[in-house]
Amino acid sequence: FLKSADQAEADFTLIGSTQKTHYTIENLQANTEYEILVKGIYQVDVALIEDGSKSVQIEKEIKQQTITMHTFNRSVVIDITNAPYNAVGDGKTLNTKAIQSAIDDCPKDGCVMIPSGTFMTGALRLHSDMELYLAKGAVLQGTSNPEDYLPRIWSRFEGTEMECYSSLLNLGVLDPEGMHRADYDSTFACKNVAIRGKGTIASGGRVLAERIIASETENLKDYLASLGDKIKECEKPETIPARVRPRLINMSNCKNVELAGVTLRDGACWNIHMIYCDHVVTHGCTFYSHGIWNGDGWDPDSSLDCVIFDCVFNTGDDSVSIKSGKNPQGNEVNIPTKGVRVFDCRCTMGHGITIGSEMSGGVEDVKIWDCDMEAALCGFEIKGTAKRGGYVKEIHVYDSVFPRVLMHSVGYNDDGIAGPDQPYFSDCTFDNLRLTGIYQDHEAKWHECDAIELCGFDKIGHEIRHVKFSNIRFGKEKLDTAGHISIKRCEDVSMNF
C-alpha cells in the first residue's frame, strides 16, 4: 500500500502483492516523500463441510509496518555517445577514455547512461554519488587485452592483499585499517553508487584470464621455481600467477552500493568482489561465468550488511562465496564478514552458496532463505583448511533446496604460513530444507552424494559444534528417499526429519 506526503489525509492505495520477501515499486515521482504500508498475510485453507471436500482460503493478517522514504532528485544524465564524449557502440572502437571522461564529469547525484550498443572498454573507475545506467541492449564490453587493465591496483584475492590488474569497474581504494577506526564511516573511499539498468556488463573472460596467467607466469618464473615441492600446496601450478587477474567489478572500502537489473558476465575470475565494504545490495541480476576458473558470482569479503536477492547464477565456481581473509594476514586484519542476507536466488549451474575457504577473519550472522540451488555442485557449503584459524558461526539456512549440506575441512588453496590455530565452525541451524542427494557437475552430469556431510577439524576443541537440522526432506521433489548422512568429529548435532 502506498501514498505520498501530499495525500496525508487519504487512504493508502494497494499497489501490488507478492509471495516473495521482496517487492519493487516503480514509476515513483522524483524528490517526493512516500509512506509505504507493508502487510504480512498468512493464508489458510478452512474446510466448509465435515469431510473436507470443499474449502475456502482465509487470509489472516500477522504483521504490518509503515515505512517513510524520500525519493532522490531527478538526475543529470550524461549519454556517453553525445559530444564531447562521442563513444561508439560498434563492438570494435575502444572507448575507455570517452567513458572515463563522462564518469569524471558526472556531478553529484548524476547519471552516466550507456545506450544500446556494444561499447568496448578497458578498466573504468567510478566515484561517489553517481549512477551508471545501462539501457536495454547496452553492453559494456571489456577487452581481452591485459594492457587495458593497467595500472595494477592494491586488492585482495583468495584472502591475501596484493597488487592485481584493475577490474573492469573499480570503486574505492583498499584500506583495511579504516574499518577499525572509531570514525570508520568517514573513511570509506566511495559511497552512494548505483549500477543498474537492463543491459550487460561483460569482461574478457577466459581469454583475458589465460593471457594474464601466461604473462605473470613468465614474470614469476624464478620465484615459482624456488618454491620446489611447496607449489603442490596450491590448487594447480597456475594458482599463484592467476591471483593477479582482475574481477569484473571490484569494490574496496565502499558503502551504500546498489547493483540492480543487469547481466554480469565473463569476469577473468570472480565477478563481483566486495572488500572491506558496508551495505552493498544486489538484486534482479543474472550472473554468467560458466567455463571460467574461479568464476564466482558474488563475493563479500570482510564486509558488513551485504544483501543479494532475486538473482540467477550460471557460474564456473561458487554462486555466492562469503569470505574474510586467509591465514595469518586474515587473522591480523581481523575484519569479519557479518550481516549477509541471501534470498530468492537460483542456480542453474555452479557450486552454490559457500562460506570460505578464506574465512580467517571470521564469518557470522548469515541468513539464507527461499533459494533454489538444486542444480548446484556443492549446494550449501562451509569450508576451510586447518591453517585458516578464524571462525564461522550463527549461520541460518531455511526454506530452500540444495543437493547437499557440507561443513568440512578442504585441502586446496592451502599454500602459505598457517594461522595461529585451526578454525571453529559452530551454531548453525538448517530448517525446512529439501536435500536431493544428487549434484550436477560442470558437464551437466548428475551424481549421487551424501545429503549431509559434517566433518570437523582434527584438533581437540575444533569439532563442529551446536548444529541443528529440523524439517528436512530428502530426495527429488515427489520422490522422497532416504538421505545418506556422514558425521565425523562433531558435538551437539541434532536432527529432526
Could you say what each language-model-derived stretch is?
Residues 1-497:
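Extracellular/periplasmic carbohydrate-active domains that bind, remodel
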